[in-house]
């Protein structure tokens, strides 16, 4: 009977400990759950394009989970899930040389183009949530919603914006020194 009581105390302690970790999400747990790769690239392009490093990391995580080889069914490529047509336009704006789709497989180029695009959207909309909505659903959709005096009309895009905002807080807390805070 004493062994059973001791076992129940141990199990209860483990369950309570696990609940504490899941609920409080200490930085070590967040780092295990939400990795940060390509730190120098993220920090460098965040600085170059006046982006909050945690925001850039959050977008990358949401788009690709830091998988440089990620591909979407819509044809988006790489860490920041850029469409080739969008990236080609960005290459022209940034003075890049001849654009090749394979450039998007390069983490440095992908994050550079994605950072430029995110900065462009932030400047255009003057609002982080609208910029994130445009990153996810496209500028045309956001412009249409705004012209009609409406908010974000796609539930997927509302979820995307909320998720990136949450991830930004996670990355800011878990990787403060790595991201230069």
Regions found by a protein language model. Give the residues of each.
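Catalytic glycan-binding domains that act on GlcNAc-containing polysaccharides
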Residues: 19-181
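Hydrophobic membrane-insertion alpha-helices, especially the h-region
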Residues: 4-21
């Amino acid at each position: 009977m004493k062994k059973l009581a001791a076992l129940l105390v141990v199990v209860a302690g483990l369950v309570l400990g696990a609940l504490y970790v899941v609920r409080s999400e200490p930085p070590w747990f967040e780092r295990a759950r939400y990795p940060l790769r390509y730190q120098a690239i993220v920090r460098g392009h965040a600085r170059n394009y006046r982006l909050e490093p945690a925001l850039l990391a959050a977008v990358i995580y949401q788009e690709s989970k830091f998988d440089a080889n990620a591909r979407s069914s819509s044809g988006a490529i790489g860490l920041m899930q850029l469409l080739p047509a969008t990236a080609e336009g960005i290459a022209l704006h940034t003075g890049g040389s001849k654009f090749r789709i394979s450039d998007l497989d390069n983490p440095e180029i992908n994050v550079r183009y994605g950072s430029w695009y995110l900065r462009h959207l932030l400047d255009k909309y003057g609002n982080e949530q609208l910029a994130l909505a445009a990153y996810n659903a496209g500028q045309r959709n956001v412009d249409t919603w705004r012209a009609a005096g409406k908010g974000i009309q796609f539930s997927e895009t509302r979820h995307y914006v909320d998720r990136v905002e949450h991830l930004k807080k996670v990355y800011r807390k878990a990787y403060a020194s790595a991201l230069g805070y």
